[in-house]
A protein has these predicted regions:
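Phosphate- and other anionic-substrate recognition elements at nucleic-acid/protein interfaces
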Residues: 1-156
Length: 156
């Protein structure tokens, strides 16, 4: 039975990526704006897995927290979206691990320290790996999905 992994970069500027290492297939979407959108996308992945005989997807959710200097309203909105994702994942019965950014980034290797350079590095890394153009907004989610087998301990 083929394994399927879902990488999630939470936040309005993030995304969700599904990855099947068996056939190297990826599918991604910009973070849905609503809880219903999150639920629908993840539930459709489960349905597709059932149709083709894949195992139940394993999720890696980037563990996030508020940042110094972030406004109160934006921090609340960010945390609310993160909690909604946790709820949807639990409601669908998906196995999930939460991983801080440094942990999944370490699986890729040495990266630039500056954020914009690091984002470009990650985008280039996923494009080389996938052989396709990947939008910047979803590059982290794709990278998380690609390193998910390692994070789950499934790469033996």
């Amino acid at each position: 039975m083929s394994e399927v992994y879902i990488g999630i970069d939470p936040g309005k500027a993030g995304g969700i990526c599904t990855y099947c290492p068996t056939n190297s297939h990826i599918d991604y979407v910009k973070m849905p704006d609503t809880v219903h959108g999150m639920f629908t996308y993840l539930n459709n992945i489960i349905k597709q897995c059932n149709l083709v005989g894949c195992s139940m997807p394993k999720v890696v959710l980037e563990k996030v927290h508020s940042m110094p200097g972030q406004g109160v309203a934006s921090t609340f909105t960010f945390g609310q979206g993160y909690g909604q994702l946790q709820g949807v994942i639990a409601a669908l019965g998906l196995q999930c691990i939460e991983v801080i950014p440094n942990k999944w980034m370490k699986c890729i290797g040495s990266m630039p320290k500056e954020k914009s350079e690091r984002k470009k590095f990650i985008k280039d890394w996923v494009e080389k790996r996938s052989g396709q153009s990947i939008p910047l907004y979803v590059a982290d989610a794709v990278a998380i999905a690609y390193v998910a087998p390692t994070l789950w301990g499934d790469n033996k």
